[in-house]
């Protein structure tokens, strides 16, 4: 198992798309931070208050809009902090979009090659290969979060007159839970990619997850559940993408428990489904 994990990590760090996506992500963060800095200078106090209330959920119900929506939760009169922009990009799934693209490319890179056929014939249990990919994606998730934090910190120092990081304890709590949620999202994407064995369809479905397209389907399920006389139940609250959006900067115990439970449940189920399909498939 350790050899398979080392092999997958070696393959991941040899993948050119890993570094290309990181570079594009860095450029995107620098560009969007520069735009945010310019826009904040033009907003009135009323507009800043409205944006703050919207970003912190004070002006909306428990729903998620279609598409990407990055809003900075900075209080009127305060300087935009690293935590504010980190939160805005995470909540809007800006970071998740880059991560799922890599997850699809990495998960399907060797599915049709002679390499995977050769390796699968040598191991006792093919499911170990899926687990090894999962470990590699966890390492990728942690590294991407660290890189994102570093680039966002540099961007804030470059584009804002005053540098403010934000409350460190709250940041670590939020970032830690979001790391696990994003890892769960990548495991879901990996499962989709390996089961379907089609880059185009897998990429489309993964992007749809980040664009909240499935909200329409979740609303349909909510209506069916409501007709069964089950009140105040929302499917979105028990999905990975829903928890990525709903998690607030001031993480409560309920938010943390729900997010952790959903993440762990999806990771276990998706790896089991993916490994079972991969084990039985004729490669």
Could you say what each language-model-derived stretch is?
Residues 103-122, 126, 134:
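Transmembrane helix boundary and interhelical loop/hinge segments in multi-pass membrane proteins
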Residues 1-25:
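Aromatic- and glycine-rich beta-strand/loop motifs that create alpha-glucan
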Residues 224-248:
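Short hydrophobic, aromatic-rich alpha-helical segments embedded in or entering the lipid bilayer
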Residues 11, 262-283:
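Junction motif at the cytosolic side of a transmembrane helix
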Residues 15-16, 124-125, 197-199:
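Short loop-to-helix capping motifs
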Residues 22-106, 130-200, 206-207, 211-215, ...:
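Secretory targeting signals
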């Amino acid at each position: 198992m350790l050899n398979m994990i080392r092999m997958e990590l070696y393959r991941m760090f040899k993948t050119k798309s890993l570094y290309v996506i990181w570079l594009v992500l860095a450029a995107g963060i620098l560009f969007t931070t520069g735009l945010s800095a310019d826009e904040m200078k033009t907003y009135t106090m009323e507009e800043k208050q409205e944006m703050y209330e919207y970003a912190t959920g004070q002006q909306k119900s428990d729903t998620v809009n279609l598409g990407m929506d990055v809003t900075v939760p900075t209080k009127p009169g305060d300087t935009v902090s690293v935590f504010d922009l980190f939160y805005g990009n995470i909540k809007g799934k800006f970071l998740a979009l880059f991560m799922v693209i890599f997850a699809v490319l990495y998960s399907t890179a060797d599915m049709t090659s002679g390499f995977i056929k050769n390796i699968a014939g040598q191991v006792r249990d093919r499911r170990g290969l899926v687990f090894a990919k999962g470990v590699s994606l966890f390492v990728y998730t942690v590294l991407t979060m660290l890189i994102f934090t570093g680039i966002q910190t540099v961007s804030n120092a470059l584009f804002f007159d005053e540098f403010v990081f934000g409350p460190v304890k709250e940041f670590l709590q939020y970032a830690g839970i979001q790391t696990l949620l994003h890892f769960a999202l990548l495991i879901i994407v990996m499962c989709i990619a390996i089961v379907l064995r089609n880059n185009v369809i897998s990429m489309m479905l993964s992007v749809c997850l980040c664009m909240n397209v499935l909200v329409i389907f979740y609303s349909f399920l909510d209506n069916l559940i409501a007709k069964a006389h089950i009140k105040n139940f929302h499917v979105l609250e028990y999905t990975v993408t829903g928890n990525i959006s709903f998690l607030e900067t001031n993480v409560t115990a309920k938010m943390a428990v729900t997010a952790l439970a959903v993440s762990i449940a999806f990771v276990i189920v998706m790896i089991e489904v993916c490994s079972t399909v991969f084990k039985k498939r004729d490669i």
